[in-house]
Every structure is written in C-alpha cells, then in structure tokens.
C-alpha cells in the first residue's frame, strides 16, 4: 500500500440541516459496486475501539462487516488518524480544558479530544483483524500540529485538500462507499466531502459506529442527507 500523508478537515459539532438519511430499501435493486466504485475505510484503528484512548462504543464490531464488504470492491482506500504529540485538538494541550469541551482555533470551533492516535504508537495502528486485500492507498490525517482532520478529502481549515478527489477521479471512480469510525465525525465529513467533490456517496450504516456526543449522530445523519449522502446497510450490496 502507498502511504499518502493525508489531510482532512475539521467538522465541529454543527447544527443539523433538515431531512433524514435515505434508507436504501427504497431503491429497486441491490447495489453492485463496479470498477468505478471505491470502499473508503475510515480510521479503524486501535485508538477508536474498546481499550483504546478514544474508544467508540462497539467500534470493533465494524471489522467483520468491513471484511465481508471488501471482496466486493476492486478499489479500497484506508484512512488513518496520525496526530503529533501535543496536537491542537488534544484537551491536554490547554490549561484547564477537559476532553469533549470546545475551543476556538484559527479555522473555527474545535472539539477537544483525549490524546489519541499519536504517530508511531500501537494506539494509532490499524486494527489487526482488518482484511483488505485490494487496498491501494492509506491516507494519514491529523499530522498538521495546529489543524484537526476529519474528512478524507479536506482539512479542517476548509482550504487544504488531501488530493484524494483527484486520485479517485484519475482512476475513473464515480461512486464512494464509506465505512468506519466514527459515523458522526470522520465518516460523516468524508461522505459529505465526497458529494461535494462530485461523487455519488453511500454510508454503510452497519459498517460504522458513532460517538454520539450531545446529539451529534442524529445531526450528522440529517446533514449527510441534506448533502445527498445515501444511508444503506451492508445487505444492500450484492455479494455481501
């Protein structure tokens, strides 16, 4: 796999737009990913599963679902949170701040997290049970010490792109399927940015888990629906 230093963009908790994510049972047939589809596996790392530094509830349950999905895709991209020590998104970088409080950085509001996914640590490693034989690219994000990164496509400053959109378009990709952790943060912002970049986008709900911080999960689904993201289950994909 190629390692591409990846930037992404921050999404603070924001108010939800109207609408609800569209379940795929409304569609006529099961989806069959072709050569123009990519599976994006977002941040399935030790830090985000039980026992990690920022565990997402039942985060490890996404691994077998993603492994079942993988053989249906000729193209897979993986993202990996890859923070510097003392990162600006860590509560420990500020006097008197606690995890899950917010602060204001130069690009806007920032949720403060426990120290997590520090470069080179086992905490930042991809989950050992992931089986992604057709993965071609790992995008590392959050390595800029002063900017958080959620989306696989843009950094939090909303100015710096990662190059992923160009990479996918150069390979003829038209449709993106997003899985991983966490639904209401990195998954949601990756999906919305995929639509922004001109791709059709599906979030595979049972291949994701959420943090759900102060209603962030419901807000994220509404925001995604408003941007054109479709909400599906792994069973909606042919061959899974």
Label each PLM-derived region with a short phrase.
Residues 132, 215-240:
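Structural recognition of alpha->loop->beta junctions
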Residues 2, 8-27:
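N-terminal export signals
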Residues 64-175:
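Active-site alpha/beta core segments
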């Amino acid at each position: 796999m190629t390692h591409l230093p990846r930037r992404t963009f921050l999404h603070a908790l924001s108010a939800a737009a109207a609408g609800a994510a569209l379940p795929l049972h409304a569609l006529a047939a099961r989806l069959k990913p072709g050569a123009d589809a990519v599976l994006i596996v977002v941040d399935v790392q030790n830090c985000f599963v039980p026992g990690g530094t920022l565990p997402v509830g039942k985060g490890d349950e996404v691994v077998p679902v993603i492994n079942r999905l993988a053989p249906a895709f000729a193209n897979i991209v993986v993202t990996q949170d890859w923070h510097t020590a003392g990162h600006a998104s860590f509560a420990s970088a500020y006097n008197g701040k606690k995890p899950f409080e917010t602060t204001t950085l130069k690009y806007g509001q920032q949720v403060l997290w426990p120290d997590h996914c520090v470069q080179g640590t086992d905490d930042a490693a991809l989950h050992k049970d992931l089986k992604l034989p057709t993965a071609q690219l790992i995008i590392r994000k959050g390595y800029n010490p002063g900017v958080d990164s959620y989306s696989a496509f843009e950094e939090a400053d909303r100015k710096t792109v990662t190059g992923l959109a160009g990479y996918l378009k150069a390979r003829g990709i038209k449709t993106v399927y997003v899985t991983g952790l966490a639904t209401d943060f990195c998954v949601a912002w990756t999906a919305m940015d995929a639509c922004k970049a001109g791709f059709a986008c599906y979030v595979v709900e049972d291949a994701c888990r959420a943090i759900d911080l102060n209603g962030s999960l419901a807000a994220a689904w509404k925001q995604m629906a408003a941007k054109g993201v479709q909400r599906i289950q792994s069973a909606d994909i042919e061959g899974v």
